[in-house]
Curated annotation (Swiss-Prot):
This protein's name: Telomeric repeat-binding factor 2-interacting protein 1
Alphabetical list of InterPro entries matching this protein: BRCT_dom (IPR001357), Homeodomain-like_sf (IPR009057), Rap1_C (IPR021661), Rap1_C_sf (IPR038104), TE2IP/Rap1 (IPR039595), TERF2IP_Myb (IPR015010)
Any one GO molecular-function label of the UniProt entry: telomeric DNA binding
Localization in the cell: Nucleus; Cytoplasm; Chromosome; Chromosome, Telomere
Keywords tagged on the record: Acetylation, Activator, Chromosome, Cytoplasm, Isopeptide bond, Nucleus, Phosphoprotein, Telomere, Transcription, Transcription regulation, Ubl conjugation
BRCT domain sequence ranges: 10-101
Its biological purpose: Acts both as a regulator of telomere function and as a transcription regulator. Involved in the regulation of telomere length and protection as a component of the shelterin complex (telosome). In contrast to other components of the shelterin complex, it is dispensible for telomere capping and does not participate in the protection of telomeres against non-homologous end-joining (NHEJ)-mediated repair. Instead, it is required to negatively regulate telomere recombination and is essential for repressing homology-directed repair (HDR), which can affect telomere length.
Phosphoserine modified-residue sites: S36, S43, S151, S153, S200, S203
One example of a Gene Ontology biological process annotation: positive regulation of canonical NF-kappaB signal transduction
Modified residues (N-acetylalanine): A2
Motif (Nuclear localization signal): 377-393
Organism: Rattus norvegicus
Family as reported in the entry's similarity comment: Belongs to the RAP1 family.
Glycyl lysine isopeptide (Lys-Gly) (interchain with G-Cter in SUMO2) crosslink, residue number(s): K111, K191, K205, K209, K237, K366
Length: 393
């Protein structure tokens, strides 16, 4: 297997915390920066602080613009780029709302904590009244539930919604978010092309129960902490790399030395770590395999296990990530080392195809030609074949 490049850090780079733009639950804050002369500098600061850059506006992303931009101030959806500079200068995460553009008249110094004495302008009053839900809000709610609700009781409890309110994905209170989901959005994921909700087996029963007594199911305890999903293909960590050859080394068998590294990505699907060589069979060859054929599982040598451990530790050190996050990245890239490294660095695979998601893993199990052809069109025949082999092992 090709050796991983030397992992060094630029001594002249930014010095602020590498987790400055990471939330308390471990998820990275997403930022969209409007084109400007300061975009490159801001991008460097955001990425060094553990944040994620989005190429397009998306639900949940913090929209950044420079003060004075008419369109940004008119919309009221943008945060001043000064927020990033102040966070870096103080090396702490500041309050976003103090930097929102265009909603209220602000003092000349927008920094939090600035004295308001002597100002003739009255203190801005809190927003009152009911805030209407937009399609973007609904998508943000459904996406958050899909990625964070780990059990049917999560959506009827309060912990999930309080956490969502704290994440500032929308401007609504947690009570309003919960009511919106239970009464209007639950079971409607297909209308937003989001696939099935993770709690769909009991959704109708829970909906009836929640409408009768929404507070009854609140356990008061947060759900088990889960490593957040890595950003989708339109969110990139830096500039996109040029396409290269996909590495044919896969990680597939478990290594006890690294401890438990199971990622709950799809039913009966655990990621195991080792390496195997050779190209996988094509989907056609795979479909011709007889069900009664038994293949002897290849044994893993101590040297291969040691190499796998070394590589994963290097990935963890290089990208400053924990074992669970690196393991999840390997899982989403079918264990391909080069693709995983490229994805962690730039947010994209070198072959240009997207990473695998839970819904497509479920579709891969269906015995349906149309579904399989759609997956081949989306991921490429070779990647589909590799995914099938990866799931088998």
């Amino acid at each position: 297997m090709a050796e991983v490049m030397d992992l060094g850090k630029d001594p002249n780079g930014p010095t602020h915390s590498s987790t400055l733009f990471v939330r308390e639950d471990g998820s990275a804050m997403s930022f969209y920066v409007r084109p400007s002369s300061a975009k490159r500098r801001l991008s460097t600061l955001i990425l060094h602080g553990g944040g994620i850059l989005c190429r397009v506006q998306k639900p949940g992303a913090v929209l950044l613009a420079q003060p004075g931009e008419a369109l940004a101030e008119a919309s009221g959806d943008f945060i001043s780029t000064q927020y990033i500079l102040d966070c870096v200068e103080r090396n702490e995460k500041l309050e976003l709302e103090a930097y929102r553009l265009g909603l209220t008249e602000q003092a000349s110094d927008p920094k939090p904590g600035a004295s308001a004495e002597g100002s003739t302008e009255p203190e801005p009053q809190p927003l009152t009244g009911r805030i209407a839900y937009t399609d973007a809000d609904d998508v943000a709610i459904l996406t958050y539930v899909k990625e964070n609700a780990r059990s049917p009781s999560s959506v009827t409890g309060n912990a999930l919604w309080k956490a969502m309110e704290k994440s500032s994905l929308t401007q609504h209170s947690w009570q309003s978010l919960k009511d919106r989901y239970l009464k209007h959005l639950q079971g409607q994921e297909h209308k937003y092309l989001l696939g099935n909700a993770p709690v769909s087996p009991s959704s109708q029963k829970l909906k009836r129960k929640a409408e009768q007594d929404p507070e009854a199911a609140d356990s008061g305890e947060p759900q088990n902490k889960r490593t957040p999903d890595l950003p989708e293909e339109e969110c990139v960590k830096g500039e996109t790399k040029e396409n290269g050859e996909a590495d044919n080394k896969l990680f597939e068998e478990a290594t006890p030395e690294l401890g438990e590294a199971v990622v709950d990505e799809s039913p009966d699907f655990e990621i195991h770590i080792t390496m195997c060589d050779g190209d996988p069979p094509t989907p056609e060859e795979d479909s011709e395999t007889q069900p009664d054929e038994e293949e002897e599982e290849p044994k893993v040598s101590t040297q291969e296990v040691g190499t796998a451990i070394k590589i994963i530790r290097q990935l963890m050190e290089k990208f400053n990530l924990d074992l669970s996050t690196v393991t999840q990245a390997l899982l989403k890239n079918s264990g391909e080392l080069e693709a995983t490294s490229s994805f962690l660095e730039s947010g994209r695979r070198p072959d240009g195809f997207p990473i695998w998601c839970r819904q497509d893993d479920l579709d891969l199990q269906k015995d349906d030609d149309d579904t399989r052809n759609a997956l081949v069109k989306k991921y490429g025949a070779q990647n589909v074949a590799r995914r099938i082999e990866f799931r088998k092992k």
